[in-house]
Amino acid sequence: MFEAANRDQSVIVHVGRSGDTRAVQLEPAAMELPDRELASRIVRLNTLAYLRSQLAIRREMEANRVEGIAGRLPTEPQVNAYAATIDF
């Protein structure tokens, strides 16, 4: 499982190895957010968790010397750049 959470851990999203959403955990602080903001945070965190799952697959493929993955799976700098946008 791959996880992404906001700073105060009030919104946590878990995705499986294939990138499928497995769970969304909402703490009381998250329930105080306006609907649009909460939805936006869930989507953005889900995207980050998905990117992390895809990066793990990329690393496995690189370790196994699989060719042709360059443009199909995210790199670590790409995932880190997206993670840096999670400013909440």
Per-segment meaning from a language model:
Residues M1-A5, S10-V15, A23-F88:
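Acidic, negatively charged sequence signal
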